[in-house]
């Protein structure tokens, strides 16, 4: 009987260890350089963090918490979608309306593919080995065969396209239309729009995260300053919680059932998913301007990009970025 209880006790201890403690700052990783930033993405297997910065992508070794290299010649970069199974990365180059395909071993660009106007967010569908480039001002999604490196479809979306998420089991890609306050569901087999769902009481959603097991979507809504939880099968809005100002990213940790919304006002709202309920459990103070974020599900750490700014002049929202101050903030429960 004692032997039968041991695995159960060990699993309970492990689960409690994962859930215990509030998030706090663990480390700052200096990156340096000048220019703005946008999305971050993690490759847990390769232990790499990809951070868009200026006209390049900074590559960080998250095992050592140090810069390991960079990917250059990516004008107007918004982010990189890693495809670990192909050892490739797909970079949205907003200023030249292209996707740069990168060899993740050498960090060299293999080729560039034409997209729609101003590709912004991006994602990789590992089940179909396809990449979606979401063209923010182009109002469409460019679908790329990740192996062949060729465009196979363009999906008209009719709106200002923001972040997306993929449900490989349901064969759907979800994406926010910020100006329409809608969530669109795309059929990944036919590359056509299947559903358009209103997100009310949410408004102007940008960030998006997905809980595949429980069929829940988490939308960061800047217009209403809320994080909305939606049923990914029916499109029904189940819950909504208040968040900070200037949200730009969402993440979800399946092990802890925690949803995160990072905001430019220097906060991350952390909420617990329990069935149809969503409850705020922590408001984490970060740094003003740290609006984009990603999570490493293997370690439960979240990463945010930030920099130091001078005092703003009269009538301005913020001051100038101090040269060489760009960094990545690492938060965890350790």
Regions of interest found by a model, annotated:
Residues 7-17:
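Bacterial N-terminal signal peptides
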Residues 19-334:
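Predominantly soluble domains enriched in secretory-pathway, periplasmic, or organellar proteins
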Residues 1-4:
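Positively charged n-region of N-terminal signal peptides that target proteins for export
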